[in-house]
Amino acid sequence: MSAEAKAGLRRTLRARRAARPPAELEAAGDALALHADALGPGPVAAFVGIRGEPPTLALLAALRARGVRVLLPLLLPDYDLEWAEYEAEDAPLVEGLRGVLQPRGPSLGLAGIGEAVLVLAPALAVDGGGRRLGQGGGSYDRALARTQAPVLAVVFDDELLDAVPAEEHDQPVHGTLTPGRGVTTFPV
């Protein structure tokens, strides 16, 4: 599918996210946290949901409460991702590039994602074949190429689509984590 088709789908999905009421977002974040036990002992590379993404702070707190080591991305000027440990909920996150909330801790570098045994990746949509539609900057496609860990795309339940356009450089995911369905894995 063309880059134009991906751009059109991104516009549609972003508009849908922008229309979600705050109460729905809050409920989605609380529901994601209920699935923390299904994510294993970690370490887990995750992210802080921003700009209409599924809220993940409650999930991160639930993982940390279980003693799971959580890594969060540090967005670089070239849109690549380094990683840092999220050490405590009471340590304020700082706003990085493009509004990405990230820990203050020392960087583990680009290869830091390799310390995770599971990756939770943001996405606008995903399909049952593991095709993930991101924001279009390539940050996660580059980062996911550096890990062998299973990857779950964190999306709203209605963002699991029949088909998502993909290009050769797009990194596949192994399943989804949604507020309503929890963890869903795809046949490999």
Predicted regions and their residues:
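A generic "cationic amphipathic patch" detector
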Residues: E26, L57-L59, W83, R132, ...
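Receiver (REC) domain switch-region micro-motif
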Residues: V44, V119-L120
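Glycine-rich, N-terminal phosphate-binding loop of Rossmann-like dinucleotide-binding domains
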Residues: V48, A123, G180
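Surface-exposed, charge/polar-rich loops and edge strands
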Residues: M1-R11, A15-R20, A65-R66, E89, ...
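Short glycine-rich anion-binding loops that position phosphate/pyrophosphate groups of nucleotides
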Residues: I50-G52, L124-G128
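N-terminal active-site beta-alpha-beta segment that forms phosphate/nucleotide-binding
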Residues: M1-G114
